């Protein structure tokens, strides 16, 4: 139970099923699950359409590695997503969770510059950033009580002001990029959840 505060916790609630926004324990008590920002809960529990489609796919193919192979569900999803992106951003990498996606994004950005013969290895993020619990994800975010035990193992990233003052944030970002060693700017689009639900204007992006 890694997300339980053991100093104050009582007995863990035994959850046996979920339905929509509700979690049901072994005595039939219902609890509203308000943690929809964590992982895969945002569509609700036991969502019939999702369950049906997952079942149908598992009857055909559960997984194949994208190393000389492909499959139509992934291709179809990429085609749908690409319609919403600029043509120079129509690239996709599927990951099992957010932290892993961040790790891969950091590695890809460094490799991109290495392939171009440029040594750009520094990352820029917004003040208050949270990108996950793996070492790279923690390194690319704001330091906190949760990352403190691992501080000696984390690489340094540069934090620029949260764009409450849009022009100040953009000016700071331009200053850092001009130094010539920035591999990537990683940011939470529109809202920082872990930092207290801080939001900024879509136009800033």
Task: Locate each region found by the language model.
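PLP-dependent aspartate aminotransferase-fold enzymes
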Residues: 79-187
